[in-house]
UniProtKB/Swiss-Prot annotation:
It is found in: Nucleus. PANTHER family: CALPONIN HOMOLOGY DOMAIN-CONTAINING PROTEIN DDB_G0272472-RELATED, CYTOSPIN-B. This is Cytospin-B. It holds the Pfam family CH. Keywords: Chromosomal rearrangement, Coiled coil, Lipoprotein, Membrane, Myristate, Nucleus, Phosphoprotein, Proto-oncogene. The modification Phosphoserine is found at residues 38, 55, 112, 131, 134, 137-138, 218, 241, 361, 366, 369, 425, 847, 863, 912, 914. The lineage of its organism: Eukaryota, Metazoa, Chordata, Craniata, Vertebrata. Residues 962-1067 form the Calponin-homology (CH) domain. PROSITE patterns: CH. Residues 29-40, 126-144, 912-922 have a biased composition (Low complexity). One of its GO terms (cellular component) is nucleoplasm. It comes from Homo sapiens (Human). InterPro entries: CH_dom, CH_dom_sf, F-actin_Monoox_Mical. Highly expressed in testis. Barely detectable in other tissues. Also highly expressed in some cancer cell lines. One of its GO terms (biological process) is blastocyst development.
Amino acid sequence: MRSAAKPWNPAIRAGGHGPDRVRPLPAASSGMKSSKSSTSLAFESRLSRLKRASSEDTLNKPGSTAASGVVRLKKTATAGAISELTESRLRSGTGAFTTTKRTGIPAPREFSVTVSRERSVPRGPSNPRKSVSSPTSSNTPTPTKHLRTPSTKPKQENEGGEKAALESQVRELLAEAKAKDSEINRLRSELKKYKEKRTLNAEGTDALGPNVDGTSVSPGDTEPMIRALEEKNKNFQKELSDLEEENRVLKEKLIYLEHSPNSEGAASHTGDSSCPTSITQESSFGSPTGNQMSSDIDEYKKNIHGNALRTSGSSSSDVTKASLSPDASDFEHITAETPSRPLSSTSNPFKSSKCSTAGSSPNSVSELSLASLTEKIQKMEENHHSTAEELQATLQELSDQQQMVQELTAENEKLVDEKTILETSFHQHRERAEQLSQENEKLMNLLQERVKNEEPTTQEGKIIELEQKCTGILEQGRFEREKLLNIQQQLTCSLRKVEEENQGALEMIKRLKEENEKLNEFLELERHNNNMMAKTLEECRVTLEGLKMENGSLKSHLQGEKQKATEASAVEQTAESCEVQEMLKVARAEKDLLELSCNELRQELLKANGEIKHVSSLLAKVEKDYSYLKEICDHQAEQLSRTSLKLQEKASESDAEIKDMKETIFELEDQVEQHRAVKLHNNQLISELESSVIKLEEQKSDLERQLKTLTKQMKEETEEWRRFQADLQTAVVVANDIKCEAQQELRTVKRKLLEEEEKNARLQKELGDVQGHGRVVTSRAAPPPVDEEPESSEVDAAGRWPGVCVSRTSPTPPESATTVKSLIKSFDLGRPGGAGQNISVHKTPRSPLSGIPVRTAPAAAVSPMQRHSTYSSVRPASRGVTQRLDLPDLPLSDILKGRTETLKPDPHLRKSPSLESLSRPPSLGFGDTRLLSASTRAWKPQSKLSVERKDPLAALAREYGGSKRNALLKWCQKKTQGYANIDITNFSSSWSDGLAFCALLHTYLPAHIPYQELNSQEKKRNLLLAFEAAESVGIKPSLELSEMLYTDRPDWQSVMQYVAQIYKYFET
């Protein structure tokens, strides 16, 4: 991808940026108003040269023009869809959401018009796709100058139309789904009404018998209704097929949007160069990497139709609420000019960069701007992933809704079939009734003919006997009926009498109790009055006695006064006669008064005595009445107690009978419930088995597909291995020829050497005879110049065979010859052990093949995914060869395990987007984890309707609004509010460090998780704590620890499923 970034360097150098020009980019409006500088003219000339080069490439390659046009169309559609969706979300968030509601749902033809317009755009020479999009479409501060070309405005208009069309298409699909739901409910209600009418008509015909056939509903009346229903069903199926087609097109577009090669190109460009601007489409197509990308796009488009439904996944959701509203999505966090695909979270674009800002020094960008850029890029990446995740969730919910619609249509078809079955059975019963009526008429005719043929006397006798028997039976039946009716009436009368007597006795008891209470009160009152009278009588007696005593004392006093008066009269008759007479008169008057008062008191005493006698007589009468009434009450109370005991016994018996009946009713209800439960269980087992069979078939098809790909890969690798074997065979043959020639030359050299030695010995003998001891020493130093010939021959041999190192030592040992022979034999026989021997031959220093420049094993016998790992790891090449060659002998699980082991990312490798996409395990779709999860999920019921009814996430979605994914996300945010280092925005990267799991479980299980001691760097500890805490309360771990540890973005569907398990356990 560096070659794609190089054409931009001269244009950037022409600007001459320095460290003092690092500033945020100006707005788009100011860029339009500003005049073109010399740098922009140079940039446009460079761009025109690139356009001409790319047009020549496309003309030279006619097969790739259609593919590139389709790719450009796809890129415009998908990039336009993302930016338009984000712009509409931002506009609706600021208050213009009512305008989108007011406009309504556009017709589907608007989308076709925009697509045709977009398709016609790339044909012209001024293609808006060839404009520079990165400097003008990013609001992030970049070190490059704000450049603008005149063709950006029509491009933005085209993209805006495409985006608006996509959004309106989604809204139209949602509205049509709602309309179809209402139509399905209406059809169901009509079917129910029709069924009720038919059952009522069938009951009427059964009750009236065969004589009332004329009153039943004729099949001619039901035929127009059936036809109307069939026409509605056909129209409904047509509309469903149209909706499915539109849904499929949208799915393809959205999936292509998620995996768009434009985003991959932008990510790789930002990964290789430190400039965080995206590469234009034309530069990617003009460079060799662009052509490579176009071929990859074609392969992806071929495979996308098979994998569209598999990538979307399956999650039960409420599609009517999974709308793209601003509060239920993450589009509001993204600006309209973000790049289409950011970098991965693990690859920092400034850590592995090998070029600084083009045309400037490496210190031109400050650390603050770098940090802000990395933060913004990471934010944009998070927002992009969350939007992709939400789009996948909406796709899944749309597919679920579509499946529900299909199930409803299937139910409708079943109801239609049942209706036809009922109609056929009705017609059969009607025909059967007609046949029976005809047979009855025949039998009646036969009976009449037989009666006519018989004699009249016997006929009359039989008739009389039959009449007598019939009258006897009728009288007996009437008598028994009357008897039973009489018994029933007697029982009812006796029961009523007993009830009336019981009620009368109860009323009598109440009255007697009330009278008794009244008499007791009267008696108490009389006693109280009697006591009062007795007290007044006693007081009167006391006063009377006092008066008597006073009277006696007065009498005695009077007598004394009389005596004194007589004495005084006798003594003082003369002097005081007048005074005495006056005193006597006063005393007499007092005496008269006292006598009058005494008479009054006596009369009062007589009256009190009379009243006392009257009160005593009344008291006696009241006591007699009380004793009489008491006896009557006791007698009646005894009678009532007896009757109440009898009634209580009867009531207890009736209660016992009622209890027995209730127990029997409960037992029967339990049996009915048990039968229903058994039936439901059997139905569930049947549905589960059907779903498991369907899933097993899907797994079988997936495995067959993967097996085909593996066999294809095996064939390619075997062909490559054969080619390598052929090359190696030729190299071995050449080496053997060289070896044979070298051995022959060695033999000739040895013969010459022996001959020279013999000559030397003879000469030495002659010299020894002639000369002395000193000459012998000089003759012994003579062989080296003689040995120059073998050396020269060896040099000649080396010159004739360049690249071959001939050993100066003794001939090669027999081991090397045997290894070469065994290697050739293994090639001839096709043994897989030759690869290891080949590598051992290259490693041995004494082998004659060590100098031959033969292609090494990793380049030929290792798969392309292993080549990436062989550059940095020290893994031996024989391991990959033996693994791949021994595949047929291993079971499938071992093959998959070995494949996932070989595809693990190397930690020493620098992470680039291409390597990361290659080494990411979920991209395979063929690992042990996926097989295990598929096997665990293979026994779940397939019906989306039953899942929708039992799913607690539907209630959560109704509570929070929006889709199930967004509702669960909001619930997690609400539960983890207040926890440090927790920011949940999606179901992939927000959960990778395990802190979100720990915080969520800490709200329910604080004793299991010490949250204050946790750290985001210790991923393994966090995940183990969370999984163990969840498993301790019964939540099964559905996530793989290895996948969570080695990937920064785990599968969001499995994470969402695990969080949904936590929600179901603690909240439902």
